[in-house]
Amino acid sequence: VEVLLGASDGGLAFVPNSFEVSAGDTIVFKNNAGFPHNVVFDEDEIPSGVDAAKISMPEEDLLNAPGETYSVKLDAKGTYKFYCSPHQGAGMVGQVTVN
């Protein structure tokens, strides 16, 4: 599953911002627009027992250039909410459900 960081029109968004995957699938987050973005999972909004630090990018680490990617596999079933730390205040948030 590929998720774009930044809409094609320049909007600060994950595209898609809500989606489903099967446990163990790889999710590739790809910088689409060239603004600095990252992917941080909210430790309070992921399945119990999952370590947010192990699935998130470090908050100071950014995908700066178009085409740069960050990949993650989620094994525990449930709903995970994530955000871009520089743009969370602008509404750049999303969620994935692992089935």
Swiss-Prot record:
PROSITE patterns: COPPER_BLUE. Residues 1-99 form the Plastocyanin-like domain. GO terms for cellular component: chloroplast thylakoid lumen; chloroplast thylakoid membrane. Gene3D superfamilies: Cupredoxins - blue copper proteins (2.60.40.420). Cu cation binds at residues 37, 84, 87, 92. It is found in: Plastid, Chloroplast thylakoid membrane. Its cofactor is Cu(2+). GO terms for molecular function: copper ion binding; electron transporter, transferring electrons from cytochrome b6/f complex of photosystem II activity. Pfam families: Copper-bind (PF00127). The keyword Transport applies. Keywords: Chloroplast, Copper, Electron transport, Membrane, Metal-binding, Plastid, Thylakoid, Transport. It is a peripheral membrane protein. Belongs to the plastocyanin family. Participates in electron transfer between P700 and the cytochrome b6-f complex in photosystem I. This is Plastocyanin. It comes from Vicia faba (Broad bean).
